[in-house]
Amino acid sequence: MAITSNYAGFEATNIMLQAQKEEDTLRLGLIAVVPNVGYKLNLRNLDVTLGVVDYTCGTTPATDAVNYEEKVLTLDKFKNEFEICKEDFRPTWSGESMGASAWNDQSPADMSAAIVASTSSKLAVWFENQIWNGAGTTGQMSGLITQFAADGDVIKAGNGITAIGAAIDKSNVSDAFDAATAAMPYSLRRKAVNFIVSPDVADAYSKLLISNGAANGLGGDANTGMVYGRYTIQTVNGLPDNSIVIFEKENITLGLGLANDADSIRVKDMDEVDFSGNVLYKSVFGGAVGYSYGSEIVWLLSTTV
């Protein structure tokens, strides 16, 4: 049996999306995901200004009381392709799976599954990094950190937060948490928020708790996970060092083109075409990430300056 396989649309979705769910951001359910974006996705931004006044008969409606905007999330389209020699895989399969002949121009079908699974797993890691750190340049998405840095509405160092002016460690991690939570606006404090940190910040806080004789912020109940005050802390390996981000899940959206027919995963046995003994892999996919309300995102990137 040839190893040629083709997956398109929803079939590709089931492969790539499941792999992506193994990474922190999707595994923990930190952001909203729209898997079937064709090209663009409108993120709604609705702001109502209250016009509360003393009661009198009649109506005097305020003008411009509702401000409605839409942020357009445009998918970037990418591809990943490579060619490998089937001969490199032959020693890893048994004679039974290869067939009775000592030489067989067809490889077992599970080689295709192995290639797809391994590549999808690596693409999931790539997506995780792009969600947070993509620079928006050729071959990259525009990641959230890049967007936060350029957005004057996002609450950050110099814009609503007085930075601690140093890399975060055991000695100052509590100060960093204090600075981030104190900067939360009322509209964010009253919501269920995600309090996420980079691995180095999580390590610093864990060391602080250990030195203070506490398992976590609740003073020893290890079943609750790591907490700070009333906030549960979650570690996201894709975040750059010295990072703290606080936001509501529904405010940030990842759009994927995995469910439309333009996206695909293909593995082609080139022996069927040019007798080269090679296998060609190609996947085509789209993605973009963005948010509706920058004023409801707290981002603290603490550095030595």
Residue positions per predicted region:
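Sequence/fold signature of self-assembling virion shell proteins
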Residues: 2-52, 103-106, 146-171, 203-305
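Short coil/turn segments at secondary-structure boundaries
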Residues: 131-136, 190-198, 218-221
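Ordered core of a single globular domain
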Residues: 175-212
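Alpha-helical scaffold segments that mediate packing/assembly in large oligomeric complexes
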Residues: 95-182, 300-305
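Acidic/polar, low-complexity extended loops/arms that serve as protein-protein interfaces
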Residues: 15-95, 125
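Solvent-exposed loop and beta-edge segments used for protein-protein assembly and interaction
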Residues: 74, 187-189, 275
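Internal mixed-charge
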Residues: 124, 128, 199, 239
